[in-house]
A protein has these predicted regions:
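Membrane-integral, polyisoprenol-dependent glycosyltransferases
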Residues: 2-380, 556-564
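Membrane-embedded architecture of ER/inner-membrane glycosylation machinery
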Residues: 2-25, 199, 203, 207, ...
Length: 574
């Protein structure tokens, strides 16, 4: 890495501009909110409206919400005829409210506009960034709190979850709200143990806990509970817990969550708890679900990818964090982070987003060390900052390979944005020792925004083959049918097809697809090559007249395999 003073004037000017933006942000809380809001939207909006529904979790959540809107049944959760009792109702209600609002505002075909279902996740991600700033103010200066929030906003994991119509961005929002309130209660009691605590922070704590429970069950209570236990053991005192108003607070939380839980028990006869707690949560702890098993230590390794670019400073910050572990601020943040992290590492099922609610604690710890100029200068740690450049370079290579393999093109449209991301990250690494870690991470954060543009705004929308369901829905709409009905052979039964083609979408074999076409006009059968022979045989046997609408060649990203489907329709009403 260069330490010379004659590095590019562009980099110096850019560095001053980024630092000036942070200076402006830290001039007042209002300015900080404006800058954080602007950067978070810059990081999250690319591709938000243009990427089709992604299989499988996003499409399942969105389809279950769509069925609520279709049936008016807002207690029960279903995907087609199958009950979906893995998660509580919170995210479905939020998505339904977003779609209803879209309909009221005149959004055409609002119920099949996936971006409307993503709005709660976008709101949750933006809110989580702002709450990271608010939580950070309990521990560090305004500048460090803003830097921590920026690291959250630019992280890879939030960039993914903030664009997905799932629970995790909203869970992050409620978790940071709860932990920020708990931090203020704890620090207040440690600094002034005899001073009476007001009702505001306990109200935030327990209301956020209720929201988290309605989103993803008791997970948020684990974050709160393990933090409280760890702090009480470390302090050798449990007295401070009274300031959280546990009895009245827990009662308030129950008042908020029990109505729906009672309603779903009355509806399901207890099968919700059997599936949600027994089949979903406990099975994830004791066994690897859906091929997502991994050994302990997986989250530690994934962290350096999912929290990039902030994760690059984690190793240099670690020695200072360890030295400060007995300070009350660092103690709280470590209590927030370590116990829950160990639980996740011990669980058999592992997915990158599970530990996301713990990342704000890491961001605040790193930001505090950066401002305190306490980062370690061990050579291998300094050399590790090359990963600021390696990640965008790897993304650029992956984008080109993706275009070549799937779209059979070089993807030239993505090159300028990938180049900007690489240049910014190159300067972040190359001038790390010249300009210091704060300016370096700011450059890397700008690079992350251009990585997002490259991947989400340019690459994914430019390769339609990655989204076969969208291709199918477009071909079916092009026929002019007002109320089309679709059946697909079993080789392609993705939730996105149900979301885009209708709740009545059926899955069958080749012969069943031929029978389906006999049902009437505007019926379409999607037949894979292996099922086409049985389809033709059955069609000939029953005298079915049919036409080929189109052959679709795409790539099923949920299983990582190519997909080829012929779209047939009956030649005339039967």
């Amino acid at each position: 890495m260069s330490t010379a003073a004659n590095d590019a004037p562009f980099a110096a000017h850019q560095s001053r501009g980024l630092s000036a933006a942070l200076d402006y942000a830290t001039g007042s809380h209002a300015r900080a909110v404006v800058i954080l809001l602007a950067f978070t939207l810059l990081a999250l909006l690319p591709g938000f409206f243009s990427i089709p529904p992604v299989d499988r979790d996003e499409a399942r959540f969105a389809q279950a919400t769509k069925q609520m809107l279709e049936t008016g049944q807002y207690v029960d959760i279903r995907f087609q005829d199958e009950v979906r009792y893995k998660k509580p109702v919170g995210i479905y209600w939020l998505q339904a409210a977003a779609v209803k609002t879209g309909e009221a505002l005149g959004v055409a075909s609002a119920r099949t506009k996936i971006w409307l279902y993503r709005v709660p996740s976008l709101v949750g991600a933006v809110g989580a960034v702002l709450l990271t700033y608010w939580a950070g103010l309990a521990f560090v200066t305004r500048r460090s709190a803003a830097l921590a929030a920026l690291m959250m906003a630019g992280s890879i994991i939030l960039g993914v979850e903030g664009r997905m119509a799932t629970t995790d961005a909203m869970l992050l929002f409620t978790s940071v709200a709860a932990m920020g309130a708990l931090a203020r209660i704890y620090l207040g009691q440690r600094h002034q143990p005899d001073e009476a605590i007001g009702w505001q922070m306990p109200a935030v704590l327990w209301t956020a806990a209720a929201g988290g429970v309605l989103l993803k069950g008791p997970l948020i209570l684990m974050f709160i509970g393990l933090t409280v236990i760890a702090l009480s053991i470390a302090d050798k005192s449990w007295r401070w817990i009274r300031a959280t108003r546990p009895l009245s607070g827990f009662g308030w939380m129950l008042l908020l969550v029990l109505p729906w839980f009672v309603a779903i028990v009355m509806k399901s006869g207890g099968s919700f708890f059997t599936q949600a707690l027994g089949h979903d949560m406990l099975d994830k702890i004791t066994s690897a679900q859906e091929a997502h098993g991994a050994p302990p230590g997986t989250y530690f390794l994934l962290f350096f990818l999912t929290f990039w670019p902030g994760s690059v400073l984690a190793a240099p910050a670690a020695p200072a964090i360890w030295r400060a572990r007995k300070e009350i601020g660092a103690r709280f943040l470590l209590a927030w982070l370590v116990p829950s992290w160990l639980v996740f590492e011990a669980a058999m099922t592992k997915l990158p987003h599970y530990v996301m609610p713990l990342y704000p604690a890491i961001a605040i710890l790193i930001a505090g060390v950066v401002e305190g100029r306490a980062l370690a200068h061990i050579r291998w740690m300094v050399h590790g900052t090359v990963s600021w450049f390696l990640f965008p370079a790897g993304v650029a290579l992956a984008v080109v390979v993706g275009f070549v393999l799937v779209d059979h093109s070089l993807g030239l449209i993505a090159w300028p944005f990938a180049a900007i991301a690489m240049v910014l990250s190159l300067f972040a690494w190359w001038l790390y020792e010249v300009d210091g870690p704060e300016r370096a991470v700011l450059r890397a954060l700008m690079s992350s925004a251009f990585v997002a543009i490259t991947v989400f705004a340019v690459t994914f929308p430019s390769i339609p083959a990655l989204f076969p369901s969208e291709m199918i829905a477009r071909e079916v709409r092009a026929t002019g049918c007002v109320d089309p009905h679709v059946a697909s052979t079993y080789s392609y039964q993705e939730p996105s097809l149900v979301f885009l083609s209708g709740t009545a979408t059926r899955f069958t074999n080749g012969a069943g697809a031929a029978e389906f076409l006999r049902s009437g006009a505007c019926h379409f059968a999607l037949v894979d090559p292996r099922s086409e022979r049985s389809f033709v045989q059955r069609a000939d046997a029953v005298g079915l007249r049919y036409t080929l609408v189109q052959r679709i060649e795409g790539y099923n990203i949920s299983i990582g395999k190519p997909v080829v489907l012929a779209i047939f329709r009956s030649a005339e009403p039967q």
